[in-house]
Amino acid sequence: YDLYGSGLPVGEALMTLDAIGSNGYALRFEVRPHPLVALLASHHIQEQASGELRDGQVRPLEYIRQTDTGRETQQAQLRFDWPAGQIAAQTHAGSAMLPLSPGVTDPLSLNLAVMSDLQRGQLPEQYALVDGIEPRIYRIRNEGEETLKTALGPVRTVRVSQTRPDGNRTTIFWFAIEWQYLPVRIARQKKGREDLRLEIRSLERSAPRN
């Protein structure tokens, strides 16, 4: 993906999704700022999530996020214990044990959950998400189909908006219908103004891992 900040190119991002065995997944996301941007405000972000698909539902097992600001490195980790019904959450600000119920996900696995629900035609109105050491409820809305002009040509998409509980931040996703609802554009808005956008640049497919 190409990364834009307030309409200007500021870096790139790489998303990797691997199928593990018959029902497992490993998802990775990395944001790399351009060298000049990194000198001014370095925010190299790496996220990874792993889990499994059961009865069409995404069940995350672990999530790790590492943010390098140039001055310090911050890390957040979530471990999902489904048999015990608990989430062990740890960040630089502290740690907590949170209750775990069906449908709860992490920030990265949320993408996979929406992709799966769109394929099944069963997109809910909200998702329960753990970010840091706090559970949050995000409102989800299907805003209909839209054809995008991308680096890979015209792509038919479904536009889906995700709004934070406080309503101050909305993220809009465009999921490609013909590519199993892979996100081809992601735009973040604060108080109605776009501050970040990802545009797909290339797509590679490989055989599933055992």
Listing of model-derived features with the role each one plays in the protein:
Residues Y1-W82, T91, S116-N210:
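Acidic, serine/threonine-rich low-complexity disordered tracts
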Residues I87, T91-P107:
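Acidic/charged, solvent-exposed loop-and-adjacent secondary-structure segments enriched in E/D, K/R, S/T
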Residues V104-N111, Y127-A128:
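Anionic-ligand-binding alpha/beta catalytic cores of soluble enzymes and soluble regulatory domains
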